[in-house]
Amino acid sequence: MSSVLQEYEAIHRELRSEGFIRSDYPPSSDEVLWNKKVMTMKREELDKLKTFRLKRIVKWAWDHIEFYRKYWKSKGFEPDMIKDWKDVVKIPILRKDELRKDLSANPPFGTIFEPELARRIRFVGATSGSTGLPTFQGWGALEMDYFQEGQARYLWTFAGVKPGRVYANYLNMSGFYSWGPPVVETAMWRCGATAIAGGGETFFSWKNRHMLIFKLWKVDVFATTPWLHRLIGEEAKEQGWETPFKVLLLHGGAAAEKTKKKLFEVHPNAELAINVWGTTDGHMAIEIPGQEGQLVVWEDMEIFDIVDPKTDEPVAEGERGELIATLLNHFTMPLIRYSLGDYVKNEFITDPDPKFGITHMRFAEPIPGRVEWMFSVKGKLLFPIYVEDAVNDVPDTTGMYNVIVYDNEMDKLKIRMETKRATVDSEYDKRAREIIASNLGLNPDDIDIEWIRPGQAVWTGYKLQVFLDQRKKK
């Protein structure tokens, strides 16, 4: 066995023996927290742990990964510059363009994989490639084990996924594959639940069969996008039955506040609706029930920092910027100071949450979307999620819409919006524009609505395509 593989397996054993990855599962059903020892660590212990793990992953990447060694040397960075976890901002930011260059020059996976571990990859996830060459994330035994641990923490603690519960995962496997059977369903099994993987086929093409499954299996916890949650609830109401879901897990994009309210209307048995943010690469943050919009980050797994996307410099506390992430336990393919592209506020709450006593930091407000989704109408900075909240106030609509963005600075907000009305008169159109304008701080004349029939909004898999990008590439 090579020294690299020996070190990798030793770290894996350490993580299990120290209890960061729970190995005795499922727990007793009366345990409230999946991993109380880790989830309630003292702040000083978390900070010390992050410093140790950041130093370790940086040294590992320097010693074993050709890509990082070359890239960091070209930027004047060396591992001994890291003295504390807060020094993460000294590490050069890595963006997808750099990965794509490496992939193109060194197919199939580039030089960012540790060569010995690359031969032992358990699973490969890929981005859609919608903005260029797809990028990949390789998962070995350690990475899979830890990510399943992270999933189990929120599924057990927040969603009540325990023995006897039935969980249905309706995330499009082609777009969210690392959140499908390789990880999420296996996390379900750790919790002792029954898992139904529904993401291997399109809901729309097998709708009647899926609706029958929901009724027959009495699904307790249902995971899909906010828009599909709503569509399924609306259709069940029209068919004269109530969905059985008690917990709604909202993936694939933050749910607007008013969308959440609509979900409780169409799913009358639902007790919780929880925003779950994550990426194919293995990042995650989950909304704590009772703490609206506050998504907790497992700090033993990653470090976040926030920068000005124009300068790459850290933004001040309370300012907004681009989310940068460092995975602390991904050794097969490290992602260190990697740009996730989400636009967030640099404000985190570190006091224990009042319900569970979880000490890991949480975002002070929801993640509204990606940096490239930002657009401006008459100088007003907007995201699709802001438009969605406004659309939900318009009567006789399905809540399904597409924002058409034709420039970064626009004179008009153009929206394709589904209406249940057979005909749209000028008065209805005027009232809709007034409602949306009032919500967004615009004038009604600044808004153009293209009215479409239910089912005509553009979707990509299980996700509503809220952002139709028609900007010319420069």
Residue ranges and their predicted role:
Residues I196-G199, F203, A273-I274, I447-I452:
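General small-molecule cofactor/ligand-binding pocket signal
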Residues A255-D351:
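Conserved AMP-binding/adenylate-forming
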Residues V219-K262, A273-D281:
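Adenylate-forming
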Residues M1-A126, G132-R153, T157, L216, ...:
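Nucleotide 5′-phosphate-binding alpha/beta core
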Residues A141-T157, V166-R230:
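AMP-binding/adenylate-forming
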Residues F222, I324-L440, P444, Y462:
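AMP-binding/adenylate-forming catalytic core of the ANL superfamily
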Residues K162-A168, K246, K414:
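Residues that mark the start of a beta-strand
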